Amino acid sequence: MKQSKVFIPTMRDVPSEAEAQSHRLLLKSGLIKQSTSGIYSYLPLATRVLNNITAIVRQEMERIDSVEILMPALQQAELWEESGRWGAYGPELMRLQDRHGRQFALGPTHEELVTSIVRNELKSYKQLPMTLFQIQSKFRDEKRPRFGLLRGREFIMKDAYSFHADEASLDQTYQDMYQAYSRIFERVGINARPVVADSGAIGGSHTHEFMALSAIGEDTIVYSKESDYAANIEKAEVVYEPNHKHTTVQPLEKIETPNVKTAQELADFLGRPVDEIVKTMIFKVDGEYIMVLVRGHHEINDIKLKSYFGTDNIELATQDEIVNLVGANPGSLGPVIDKEIKIYADNFVQDLNNLVVGANEDGYHLINVNVGRDFNVDEYGDFRFILEGEKLSDGSGVAHFAEGIEVGQVFKLGTKYSESMNATFLDNQGKAQSLIMGCYGIGISRTLSAIVEQNHDDNGIVWPKSVTPFDLHLISINPKKDDQRELADALYAEFNTKFDVLYDDRQERAGVKFNDADLIGLPLRIVVGKRASEGIVEVKERLTGDSEEVHIDDLMTVITNKYDNLK
């Protein structure tokens, strides 16, 4: 394709709010154009990359007998009300009304709709298992879209749904999909790691995320260097081994702590280590207030709280709620209280006595507080995030951290949707059973961004061969010169029969062409320049920067060999 005919609006400067390198490079190289916050158009080069990604996805889905369909993005509210997610999903669900006042949602996911499609069709165990997938735009009303395609309000996704007669069948499809995802991310050029994860609003009993390792990743991965252990930090279990630091029990004292609001400020004020401070936070669980205690250097993990209490209806109490409940602001909270409120403490609080806690009065704290004498703990549990260097639950070693971008996730849904939506089949005994389900997602547009995040240098993108928008970049330095133009035209005609070629025939300065070529990042470059009359051209590899002069008689052999050896 001739570059003069392709819409590639490269940029010299990018908006300052473009923080991620992938966001900056996708804008700068003319692959995407922002419409408004979190919404982008995919321009010709990006569309070609997306087509290459989706071709790989389709191949791997068909390899495991997953069948492609296409469902509407617009979904009626009644389906979401059946599953209970219309109210539970929250403000991220984009809702709208038609002219008749009927409620709809622009789908962020399609569990309800696909269940409604199959519930009157998959009637017998003989029709199972069945796996359906689609590739489609999804919508989520992100509060703060950021990092370009990594967290947008409209995004492209591959979502698949499987239906089974028994758990063994689900386990097999889950494993097949897990392996397919591993192959997909390897083929598109992403270093992705599967990690144990939380199922979030989708639900289900078991899930893995596929994380593309990246410094700008919004998720923290906990992993072992001694085993295959890897988990999202939200799910990483903290191993409790008692390490009591008990001292002689001291009398309770109330002390003035002016302008002290955080655990670290309190530790500094008292001249004590922050891990000897105990923080108190108030949560509302299914409408009931509870207190949760952790040591000063630990952070409460609300995902673990949701798992512990078996509900998603958990939220941190607001400042007004806290003041109305205990008469003090959040920085002064403590468990010594004359109100009926259940108290839960992280396991590691047990290691301390003579605690330092808030006095439930602004500007004051209590020291030498002791469990049993001054307050009681209803239950202890693992309520916090793991720290780097702590022991891992598989016994393999200690926790190491890395950042990652979630590019895919697989779920075992069980009967969460089929039971609520009455999707049943007859088993081999003729009894009605709820369909057992799995769901599996890949962020296609997010994968595009993750590829760029992992494959770039200071000059631009470095596309992996499998997804590159074109194989070769043919550049005529000065098309006004007959020998250069004629040779470049001839090479374009020859190589275009075997490779996808982007032919830069523009009337631009050589520096502009070379800068754009580096920015766009095609794997191989052929430059027709001053030695065109001798039949000599330059061949350059984008990844290594290696270049050599080659006679046109040898050019096809050289290019073919180099292309075959590309990653």
Curated annotation (Swiss-Prot):
The keyword Transmembrane helix does not apply. Its main location: cytoplasm. It catalyses: tRNA(Pro) + L-proline + ATP = L-prolyl-tRNA(Pro) + AMP + diphosphate. InterPro entries: aa-tRNA-synt_IIb, aa-tRNA-synth_II, aa-tRNA-synth_II/BPL/LPL, Anticodon-bd, Anticodon-bd_dom_sf, Pro-tRNA-ligase_IIa, Pro-tRNA-synth_IIa_bac-type, Pro-tRNA-Synthase_IIa_type1. Pfam families: HGTP_anticodon (PF03129), tRNA-synt_2b (PF00587), tRNA_edit (PF04073). Consists of three domains: the N-terminal catalytic domain, the editing domain and the C-terminal anticodon-binding domain. Homodimer. This is Proline--tRNA ligase.
